[in-house]
From Swiss-Prot:
Biological process annotations from GO: nickel cation import across plasma membrane; response to antibiotic
PANTHER family: HIGH-AFFINITY NICKEL TRANSPORT PROTEIN NIC1
One Gene Ontology term of the molecular function aspect: high-affinity nickel cation transmembrane transporter activity
Family, as annotated: Belongs to the NiCoT transporter (TC 2.A.52) family.
Effect of residue 82 to I: 66% decrease of nickel uptake. Decreases or abolishes resistance against several antibiotics
Native source organism of the sequence: Mycobacterium tuberculosis (strain ATCC 25618 / H37Rv)
Keywords: Antibiotic resistance, Cell membrane, Ion transport, Membrane, Nickel, Nickel transport, Transmembrane, Transmembrane helix, Transport
Protein's name in the database: Nickel transporter NicT
Misc note: Overexpression of NicT in E.coli and M.smegmatis enhances tolerance towards several antibiotics (norfloxacin, sparfloxacin, ofloxacin, gentamicin, nalidixic acid and isoniazid).
Subcellular location: Cell membrane
Catalytic activity: Ni(2+)(in) = Ni(2+)(out)
Amino acid sequence: MASSQLDRQRSRSAKMNRALTAAEWWRLGLMFAVIVALHLVGWLTVTLLVEPARLSLGGKAFGIGVGLTAYTLGLRHAFDADHIAAIDNTTRKLMSDGHRPLAVGFFFSLGHSTVVFGLAVMLVTGLKAIVGPVENDSSTLHHYTGLIGTSISGAFLYLIGILNVIVLVGIVRVFAHLRRGDYDEAELEQQLDNRGLLIRFLGRFTKSLTKSWHMYPVGFLFGLGFDTATEIALLVLAGTSAAAGLPWYAILCLPVLFAAGMCLLDTIDGSFMNFAYGWAFSSPVRKIYYNITVTGLSVAVALLIGSVELLGLIANQLGWQGPFWDWLGGLDLNTVGFVVVAMFALTWAIALLVWHYGRVEERWTPAPDRTT
């Protein structure tokens, strides 16, 4: 039993650490082809159609500058802390299940961008009734979409945080047994794989996230807050004339550019974390060492950002005021997102340095049984 478990684990590790297959290269190529297409459609529309038309919005030129603003908003929003936490933690979960999820960030950002694009399409098709509510922070539409989006985002991050807490406790227990020499390699692998407590509580949800594309609806739900949609809509609707005089292609190029920027960086983030975790899953000792560090960081990030979102939502709904609540409400999640990305990259780099110079694998790998 233990031998077959170890054989399955070695097969899984070999699968994750081998070179990309032709099918995986094909999927990566399709992802980046979509990203390139978004860039081409967005920028060619701006440069070849919008800019030569000399359109104006609120007395100001509507051209490359506005397109660059939309693109920059997409790049910036890719570093939102909730994006980083959701993508990186889901990558961990799928890799621990034996998958190689190359497109988690890609599908998450596509789902998020769909909300923005859908709003723009409604504007183009004449549903001007949503213009005022989307522009107005105190409107009922803005209120309830923000409530729904933030609640889903915070709850998802807490769910991911709980998942990682349970995983972390199990890994620490395995590590303690390893240091005492109580288990051989096969038993250690069995302990790492027997993390079924989470399934008892969150089985349906965790089982549903088995493919990278499952992050598309998650990204869509995250986008229901209309925070980013409002940024794009305000670009189009600013001024008293709103979007009344603009052609459809001028309006739709903005969410396309927004999606291009966000998809690019979210895809790079997901791919980077995929290969970083791939190194960690190649042997039992690496899994223990790396996962204690990174899972602890994942727990901290998910629970921190989830707490900020949910506490801010509760304080806003209940009208709580004071120095702490004012500080909490003023936190910039974009800045936090950049910090989170740096923390993940730095943790990976430090883990590799300590691994190399501390001879961790040599010191922690159980000695082979010499009686057989």
